Regions:
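C-terminal helical "tail/cap" subdomain of flavin- and related membrane-associated enzymes
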Residues: 1-2, 79, 285, 306-307, ...
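A short coil-to-beta-strand element that immediately follows conserved catalytic motifs
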Residues: 178, 193-197, 223, 258-276
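Short helix-loop capping/hinge motifs at secondary-structure junctions, enriched
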Residues: 188-194, 216-218, 235, 259, ...
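Short glycine/proline- and charge-enriched loop/turn segments
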Residues: 31-34, 87-93, 231-235, 317, ...
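Active-site substrate-recognition segment that forms the wall
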Residues: 75, 196-235, 253-255, 278
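Conserved N-terminal helical subregion
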Residues: 2-4, 21, 46-168, 172-185, ...
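Conserved mid-domain beta->alpha element of the FAD-binding
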Residues: 5-24, 28-34, 154-155, 182, ...
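Acidic/histidine metal-binding catalytic segments
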Residues: 64-65, 121, 255-271, 330-335, ...
């Protein structure tokens, strides 16, 4: 068959399927899970990603289930405001920034794929075990001896990608950053503006990231995503996304009683907690091998400190679709896609390790020796804070100037 075969029905795979279909390029998606369900917690979609989703006609659908994030706020662990800035359209972007439940995003993409491309073009319970290729196409292999043929294959199967492991068998396990995370969602009254992305504290003693992902219910409560992050030199290899225990981390936030949020009470109100290590992989020298290539987390997994993982997968899909539209030969198309995206994502992977947006918190933590301040201007200038924030936007490709170029 002449189809592009997409391995993985997550955010990257579904967005790619919609993008290829819009360009008239036939595709099929093969997903390991028996059913694609609305699972997970919250993520952020920055304006460079929402711009691409708007091109696919999805902005209205996303607006109905997401929060249009209006501002970012940075606090120390004493609840003192360090810096705040507008986000999305409030910052003059042409497109919004969305804070959204990962499951809601997944369902918007899945519903759009089924209605536009066809429910018969996505195959669940199809765990790809490997890929072979020849001059005419590729063969995906599944358990029990099943297989399927296509023109080319794109692996969108995440950080534990089977196809990535096939091409890089000696790479080893994902690289642990030294930070452990506990994540949850809590129904709570609106915090700050009710559309704020809030970061507080620092990793050495405990850091929180907090943002709403659904509008308030009739009782006035929003669904609010939170992430607790603490430097933990070692972690025991356990199930990814395992159930977490409050006792393992809540002590770091026991005295976080601020006038804008009682953090311990907020954490304890979560229905459940997930625990997993903050990991990435070292950037690869190449993604493409003939008629097979990698996309999203399969290509460039990054630590989640820049609200950028899903967004970079979405940007990959645009580059991939453009390359396949311009090149009838998938080998040439994949080479063009890799040339467009590999260096850019490598910079982001490395920047997320050392100077992500929360570097603002690190800078103040170090300059104050983790003590309260009388005035933030005595610690760091406003211009320095703006420069730290703008630097990441430039590297990650979502400055206003870059998006209007």
């Amino acid at each position: 068959m002449d189809d592009i075969l997409i391995v993985g029905g997550g955010i990257g795979g579904l967005t790619l399927g919609l993008s290829l279909h819009a360009a008239g390029i036939p595709c099929r998606i093969f997903e390991s899970a028996a059913e694609i369900r609305a699972v997970g917690v919250g993520i952020n979609l920055l304006p460079h990603a929402t711009k691409e989703l708007a091109v696919l006609g999805l902005e209205d659908d996303l607006s109905r289930v997401a929060i249009k994030t209006r501002d970012a706020s940075f606090f120390n662990r004493f609840g003192q405001l360090i810096y705040e800035e507008p986000l999305g359209r409030a910052a003059g972007y042409d497109n919004p920034q969305f804070s959204i439940h990962r499951g809601d995003l997944q369902m918007v993409l899945l519903d759009a794929f089924k209605s536009r491309v066809g429910a018969d073009r996505i195959f669940t319970d199809h765990h790809c075990t490997g890929v072979e290729q020849d001059d005419a196409g590729v063969t995906l292999h599944f358990p029990n001896g099943q297989s399927t043929r296509g023109r080319a294959a794109i692996a969108c199967d995440g950080i534990n990608s089977v196809i990535r492991k096939q091409f890089f068998p000696d790479e080893g396990e994902p690289r642990y950053s030294g930070v452990n995370m506990w994540r949850g969602v809590t129904r709570w009254k609106p915090i700050l503006s009710g559309a704020s992305l809030t970061r507080a504290g620092w990793l050495s003693h405990g850091k929180m990231v907090i943002y709403p992902i659904r509008e308030a219910d009739p009782g006035g409560l929003q669904l609010v995503n939170w992430v607790a992050e603490i430097e933990t030199p070692k972690y025991r290899r356990r199930d990814w996304n395992r159930a977490g225990s409050l006792d393992d981390f809540i002590g770091a936030f026991a005295d976080w009683h601020f006038d804008w949020l009682d953090v311990p009470a907020f954490i304890r109100a979560a229905d459940s907690v997930l625990e997993f290590p903050m990991v990435d992989q070292d950037p690869l020298p190449r993604w493409s091998f003939g008629r097979v290539t990698l996309l999203g987390d399969a290509a460039h997994p990054m630590v989640p400190r820049g609200s950028n993982g899903a967004g970079q997968a979405i940007l990959d899909t645009r580059a991939m679709t453009s390359a396949l539209s311009a090149n009838a030969d998938p080998v040439a198309a994949f080479a063009a896609y890799e040339k467009e995206r590999l260096e850019k994502t490598t910079r982001i992977v490395l920047t997320n390790r050392t100077n992500p947006p929360d570097a603002i918190l690190r800078e103040v933590y170090q300059r104050t020796n983790d003590k309260p301040f009388k005035a933030i201007g005595d610690v760091i200038s406003h211009d320095e804070l703006v420069a730290l924030s703008d630097s990441y936007k430039q590297i990650a490709g979502f400055s206003r100037e870059a998006l209007r170029a």
